[in-house]
Amino acid sequence: LGTGPSSFQVRQRLVGAGVEVLTPELVGDIGVVIQLIDKGGTMCSVVTAGVESEPSRTTLDRIELREGDVVHVAASDMTNAHAAVELSEWAAALPPFVTLVVSVSPAVVQVPVEAWETILPRADVVTMNDWEASALADILDRTRCGSTIRSYMRPDAATVRRVGNRGCKLQLGADAPIITIPAFEVAIADTAGVGDTHIAEMCAGILLGHDLETACLMANAGAALAVSHESALPVPTREQVDNVLETGVVTNILR
């Protein structure tokens, strides 16, 4: 976060939610996202970068990591050449007691391929939707003919593929069967932030000590709540997610 007004607002929200910011503030402000939503609820984002595109390896190395921590790095974090090097190399050097979640995100085509080659071998979980998976596979294949996303990952690492209203598909290892995690039925009002919500809920499940299959079911519940109302905010609470898991019923959390 920076010193500007947008950073101030985000910091206030984080403090209100009990989230500690571990990195020092930078001079400047965070970027801005303009979201375009069509009548069917499909969302497209236009992003301008800010201080978040200037991570420092020195600052990252000062973060105190503890056993059981989860680190999430998204493709959108690595679209800047400097950020791609700093984040991918830091993530690749994370200690084994930290779970690294890498999300491919719509910005996949803007990430230098070297960053993917650096970060994927360390990833414990790679999450993506169908389009993102296809785009990344094409990029890697063009770089090294015949290679796939799995070619760069450890055999024991997991992949999560989000498939919209069909939920998500989980593979716990290279030779493991694909497990379909069902979605929850919901009327879609707005898809803004649904991918981010799914990833965040999954990471929360991992932090709580759940197995990845349970964490993905939590993620599906959170995603269903996220699309039940207009706007990416507010994000679902733990109580709301638990209620969906218990009842199977999704209601608009703004009503």
Language-model features: locations:
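Short alpha-helical
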Residues: P5, D29, A187
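Ribokinase/PfkB-type carbohydrate-kinase core domain
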Residues: T3, F8-E25, I37-I178, P182, ...
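Conserved post-catalytic alpha-helical subdomain immediately downstream of the catalytic base
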Residues: R154-A158, A183-I253
